[in-house]
């Protein structure tokens, strides 16, 4: 695959700070298992490179990154609530067995 450069990404994102923030957030999402939005993604690419490729290809923007973060946060909260509910049920079962 062609080499991606910061200049390629700066054609899409206005400044370097914003580019770094977008790329780091997206790379974290990719590292945590979110599927890449570019076709023919090279499996050997590290998450940071994949994030930069998505930005340069105009497949990702701040709104989409925020949407994915929100969905991941809601999923984590839901799992935490389910875990807590399961612990309460287990504690109740154990206290019934103690009686």
UniProtKB/Swiss-Prot annotation:
GO biological process annotation, one example: DNA-templated transcription initiation
GO annotations of cellular component type: cytosolic DNA-directed RNA polymerase complex
Gene Ontology MF terms in the entry: bacterial-type RNA polymerase core enzyme binding; DNA binding; DNA-directed RNA polymerase activity
Superkingdom, taxonomy of origin: Bacteria
Pfam family, one: RNA_pol_Rpb6
EC number: 2.7.7.6
Assigned keywords, A-Z: DNA-directed RNA polymerase, Nucleotidyltransferase, Transcription, Transferase
Family matches, as SMART domains: RNA_pol_Rpb6
InterPro entries (alphabetical): DNA-dir_RNA_pol_omega, Pol_omega/Rpo6/RPB6, RPB6/omega-like_sf
Recorded catalytic activity of this chain's protein: RNA(n) + a ribonucleoside 5'-triphosphate = RNA(n+1) + diphosphate
Similarity comment text for this entry: Belongs to the RNA polymerase subunit omega family.
HAMAP family reported in the protein's UniProt record: RNApol_bact_RpoZ
Biological role stated in the UniProt entry: Promotes RNA polymerase assembly. Latches the N- and C-terminal regions of the beta' subunit thereby facilitating its interaction with the beta and alpha subunits.
Assembly, per entry: The RNAP catalytic core consists of 2 alpha, 1 beta, 1 beta' and 1 omega subunit. When a sigma factor is associated with the core the holoenzyme is formed, which can initiate transcription.
Protein's recorded name: DNA-directed RNA polymerase subunit omega
Organism of origin: Xanthomonas campestris pv. campestris (strain ATCC 33913 / DSM 3586 / NCPPB 528 / LMG 568 / P 25)
Gene name per UniProt: rpoZ
